[in-house]
Amino acid sequence: MSSKLVLVLNCGSSSLKFAIIDALNGDEYLSGLAECFHLPEARIKWKMDGGKHEAALGAGAAHSEALNFIVNTILAQKPELSAQLTAIGHRIVHGGEKYTSSVVIDETVIQGIKDSASFAPLHNPAHLIGIAEALKSFPHLADKNVAVFDTAFHQTMPEESYLYALPYKLYKEHGIRRYGAHGTSHFYVTQEAAKMLNKPVEEVNIITCHLGNGGSVSAIRNGKCVDTSMGLTPLEGLVMGTRSGDIDPAIVFHLHDALGMSVDDINKLLTKESGLLGLTEVTSDCRYVEDNYATKEDAKRAMDVYCHRLAKYIGSYTALMEGRLDAVVFTGGIGENAAMVRELSLGKLGVLGFEVDHERNLAARFGKSGFINKEGTTLAMVIPTNEELVIAQDACRLTA
């Protein structure tokens, strides 16, 4: 066990993901999820020393109770882990324009996260709770807490990519622009893709597809992000588990005027009741859609719309590659495991030279990386993401 252990925290509105990772070699000593906050069934699950464990946190428990359990119950069994913690890394969904890289957390950074909360109202307030609780639980690491922003990797986008065609003062005065998300994942797979392509990162031209319950595509030119599908918020872009992605903005007015829906109703519809859930009217789970594609109309409908949208983004981002696309990369829970999504999406892009090898595609699942294209065709690859490792490495580097 090295002396570069980092506690990685990812606080959501109703959950907390945590891990202790060796920032030098990526070894994971603890990982877990506390979930169902504020509900009677609040619970925590974790993996340590090869064993799986679960416990109730108590009715109504939230971030404070979860971190208390991690410190006083889980880590109490392994005091050597606590003793060797050198830093705490926090995933922060939105850093606005202010943060282009990870930073050590101080009062100014906390204020910056608050200032960006209107763009991530479910996530940023939860991150602030996580930071406050971590400072309480680990006072000896007070100056070793690091914020790693999901938006930072996308701050290299040029103005023509991040501006909306709205009155310019809305950007200048209120920061309304494209920010993107999943930046930590897009960054990680870009680094890994460069290794697989045997190229320096700064020479890599790829399109990265992070597909999970949320999903986004990024255009990476010369190793830097030049466009991404998520926008001001994570609602824009691809079809997602429960999010609509791109729609005609006038649908919002129609829902209000013709159906009498309130702003809150429409927000809930677009963020929690749309996407795969809306199209199937049954579930947001891509596994259902894949398993039932050949036999159920709802599954086929959802999969076809999902892959059509994804193929459109890959195709359009090819135009930003300045004449050379090295590869398309799939990552995230769906990107890494849903072979059908990859095959159907790339099957629409034969004009760009894509041809999926069925056997290679099936082999690149369940944590395995690899190329999935037929020999001699445009490269496509699967790379399992590791956002926690990036967060641990940044936290270690900035607090050394």
Curated annotation (Swiss-Prot):
Gene3D superfamilies: 3.30.420.40. Its cofactor is Mg(2+); Mn(2+). GO terms for cellular component: cytosol. Transmembrane segments: none annotated. Mg(2+) binds at N10, E387. It catalyses: acetate + ATP = acetyl phosphate + ADP. Pathway: Metabolic intermediate biosynthesis; acetyl-CoA biosynthesis; acetyl-CoA from acetate: step 1/2. ATP binds at K17, H210, L211, G212, N213, G214, D285, C286, R287, G333, I334, G335, E336, N337. It is an enzyme of class 2 (transferase). Keywords: ATP-binding, Cytoplasm, Kinase, Magnesium, Metal-binding, Nucleotide-binding, Transferase. It is found in: Cytoplasm. InterPro entries: Ac/propionate_kinase, Aliphatic_acid_kin_short-chain, Aliphatic_acid_kinase_CS, ATPase_NBD. NCBIfam families: ackA. Homodimer. This is Acetate kinase.
